[in-house]
Regions:
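Acidic, His- and aromatic-enriched active-site or binding-groove loops in soluble protein domains
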Residues: 100-106, 172-188, 255-267
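Generic structural signal for hydrophobic
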Residues: 69-70, 92, 145
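Short acidic, glycine/proline-enriched helix-loop-strand junctions
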Residues: 88-103, 204
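Eukaryote-biased recognition of electropositive, low-complexity segments
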Residues: 234-236, 240-274
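Domain-core and long-helix interface of multi-subunit machines
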Residues: 7-25, 34-57, 125-248
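Short, charged, surface-exposed secondary-structure boundary motifs
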Residues: 108-116, 244, 266-267
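Divalent metal-dependent hydrolysis catalytic cores, especially in the metallo-beta-lactamase
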Residues: 51-53, 59, 65-87, 150-153
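A basic- and aromatic-enriched beta-loop-alpha substructure that forms the phosphate/nucleotide-
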Residues: 114-128
């Protein structure tokens, strides 16, 4: 085995150990499994310039195909995070299905001219319209989400759009201060990127968060309501209905059986657990 192969193997093992370590903290009877990042054909306005020029969607996968894959991979609750819209979620809710409303919004850090993706959950159709406007300024976007108790996750934190070239490390400090939740396992990214992201998030001690705030020249709690709490999530980022649900997040819901017996919806339990 050459050095490159050995390196990739060790990265894979480290990522698996990180996942197993986190999973072991949740009692087996109090787990909800959800893929927090997947797409169907309602992701029809791609971010990529070529896709916009050609007028093609990011995927032609139907909702039924996506749901079948999610079920086959053992998810307990469904969300569909299409780009900048939650049409699939609203359609499923209209059919009487229990769904956690979600979308992947393309947002901009205006002071750096850097584009990022923010997974957002628990909003209403009216709030979706407002989020679509605010996404051009991620600071206003996050403020609105905090004000209305909407859950946000920074998707694939090491992948962003920077037309002016590689941005300064201050961008990473700003992102670390902006968000509480980070997608550290993305099914479309190589193990090295996921491990590097997990290491970055795990390194956000209280001391490091204060150092980040000094470098960013802002108070630690300017945006985050709980600046010292950092959570890690996972999602398949599936666009082909091939891997949806094979990567995801295990949520901890204490007294899950009692909540289900009392008639609580899985979507509400998932939202509260996030």
């Amino acid at each position: 085995m050459n050095n490159a192969s050995l390196f990739r193997q060790r990265l894979g093992e480290e990522l698996e150990n990180t996942i197993l370590r986190s999973q072991s903290l949740i009692p087996e009877g109090e787990r909800l499994r959800i893929d927090l990042h997947c797409h169907d054909r309602n992701s029809d306005k791609p971010d990529e310039r070529l896709g916009r020029m050609l007028g093609v969607p990011e995927t032609w996968v139907t909702t039924d195909e996506l749901l079948a894959t999610l079920r086959s991979n053992g998810t307990d609750i469904v969300t569909v995070t299409n780009h900048n819209n939650a049409r699939t979620c609203w359609e499923l809710l209209e059919k009487g299905q229990d769904v956690l409303p979600g979308a992947e919004f393309s947002c901009t850090l205006p002071d750096f001219e850097v584009g990022i993706h923010v997974l957002t959950y628990g909003f209403t159709p009216a709030q979706e319209e407002r989020l679509a406007v605010l996404r051009k300024d991620v600071y206003r976007f996050v403020d609105y989400c905090n004000e209305h108790d909407l859950v946000t996750v920074l998707a694939h934190p090491l992948q962003f759009h920077s037309p002016k070239g590689i941005p300064s490390m201050e961008v990473m400090d700003r992102l670390g201060l902006l968000f509480e939740r980070f997608e550290v396992v993305n099914g479309q990214r190589d193990a090295w990127q996921n491990v590097l992201t997990a290491t970055w998030v795990e390194g956000m001690s209280e001391e490091e968060i204060h150092a980040m705030a000094r470098r960013a020249r802002q108070p630690v709690d300017l945006f985050a309501r709980r600046p010292y709490i950092k959570r890690m999530t996972g999602g398949s980022d599936d666009h082909m209905a091939m891997y949806a649900g094979s990567t995801g997040t295990i949520l901890h819901v204490p007294d899950l059986a009692a909540h289900r017996k009392a008639g609580a919806s899985l979507s509400s339990l998932a939202l509260n657990a996030l």
